Amino acid sequence: EALIHDIAEMKRLGFNMLRKHIKVEPLRWYYHCDRLGMLVWQDMMNGGESYSPLSIYVFSNLGLRVKDDRYRYFSRSDEAGRTHYYEELGQMIDLLYNTVSLALWVPFNEGWGQFDALKAAEFIRKRDDTRPIDHASGWYDQGGGDIKSIHWYFRPYHHKQLQDRKS
């Protein structure tokens, strides 16, 4: 009942999409989103070692372009952890693939544990080519995926229209 109330209340307030930020809900929640007509923006869970404030908060807001194959910079130096990430990403996609309301996959948000985001987008696309992918939501865009989302908190933002992706 609480799940239904929360989703219905968001619809009443005018929302048509909910973001599942770094977590996966029980399947019943997705069922109610399907039934009530609420779209879902699905993030993958964060991972990696302790994050550096410089890489997560400072450099990203300076607009610096950083390649995400610098694993130590993104707190992803552990190769076994990177392998495990793909195992869990595959499990999440397989679990939620038939969710009608699922509208967008997001493997990485704001650089938290980000690595090889272009490869992550390819991995997702091979498992599910029916939904758009925001490969690096917010910061450290690597030029891939279907969407370029910018999380801009501290300075005025000036929009530039992209030709190859939605922005």
Where are each of the predicted segments found?
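N-terminal active-site wall of soluble small-molecule enzyme domains
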Residues: 4
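Substrate-binding/catalytic cleft of secreted carbohydrate-active enzymes
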Residues: 7-9, 17-167
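Metal- or metallocofactor-binding catalytic centers and their adjacent structured scaffolds
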Residues: 13
